[in-house]
């Protein structure tokens, strides 16, 4: 999700943003449409999402290998470990493209892990700050995060694909809304 506050906006050149206002709005419309498509067609968008993530993993693996050999030092172990990570990226990316169903399940497991970690962190935060006013919200959000992680992990394959596609669709729609509000800050003056 895009997070843009006043401090970020002040760092941008105002004239440059006014020139690119239409492009920002166009990207926002595309994000909104893709978000709606992800929610409307979860299985097709799940396959596409897995393929895109696989392609990005392959590009990352290639970039890591190129970076290793162009910037290598005389230390053997960092180069070897970086090469092994690059090979892992390439293999995982290949499997994401070759078997999109497995890729989307891996994405679902990763998202479940993120929710679980976030839930544990929120619960720890609540426990440390339980005497403070309003700390109960940390408890509620932490429990909800763990419940969402459990739903992701315990879901059937069809539900898992639907959950991931819906989550990505909602995220894209919120990013589109954020870009629309960002673009509306820079109205062209006649």
Curated annotation (Swiss-Prot):
Write out the topological domains of type Cytoplasmic: 1-25, 71-76, 127-138, 188-190
Per UniProt, what is the membrane topology?
Multi-pass membrane protein
Q: Which GO terms describe its cellular component?
A: plasma membrane
Query: Ranges in the Periplasmic compartment?
Result: 45-47, 100-103, 162-164
Question: Signal sequence span per UniProt?
Answer: none
Tell me the InterPro entries matching this sequence. Answer: Acid_resist_chaperone_HdeD, DUF308_memb
Instruction: Provide the transmembrane region boundaries.
Output: 26-44, 48-70, 77-99, 104-126, 139-161, 165-187
| Predominant subcellular localization, coarse grouping | membrane
* GO terms (BP aspect): response to pH
Keywords attached to this entry? Cell inner membrane, Cell membrane, Membrane, Transmembrane, Transmembrane helix
Q: Where in the cell?
A: Cell inner membrane
Q: Which Pfam families match?
A: DUF308
NCBIfam families attached here? PRK10209.1
Which protein is depicted? Protein HdeD
Provide the species name: Escherichia coli (strain K12)
Q: Which gene encodes it?
A: hdeD
């Amino acid at each position: 999700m895009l997070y843009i506050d006043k401090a970020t906006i002040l760092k941008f050149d105002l004239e440059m943003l006014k020139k690119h206002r239409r492009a920002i709005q166009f990207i926002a419309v595309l994000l909104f449409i893709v978000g709606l498509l992800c929610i409307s067609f979860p299985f097709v968008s799940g396959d596409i999402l897995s393929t895109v993530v696989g392609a990005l993993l392959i590009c990352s693996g290639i970039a890591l290998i190129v970076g290793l050999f162009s910037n290598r030092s005389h230390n053997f172990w960092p180069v070897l470990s970086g090469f092994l990570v690059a090979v892992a990226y390439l293999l995982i990316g290949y499997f994401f493209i070759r078997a999109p169903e497995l890729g989307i399940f891996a994405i679902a497991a990763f998202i479940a892990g993120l929710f679980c970690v976030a839930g544990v962190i929120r619960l720890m935060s609540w426990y440390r700050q339980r005497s403070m006013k309003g700390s109960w919200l940390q408890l509620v959000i932490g429990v909800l995060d763990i419940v969402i992680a459990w739903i992701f992990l315990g879901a059937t394959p069809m539900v898992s694909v639907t959950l991931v596609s819906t989550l990505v669709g909602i995220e894209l729609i919120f990013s589109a809304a954020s870009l629309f509000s960002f673009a509306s800050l820079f109205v062209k003056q006649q």
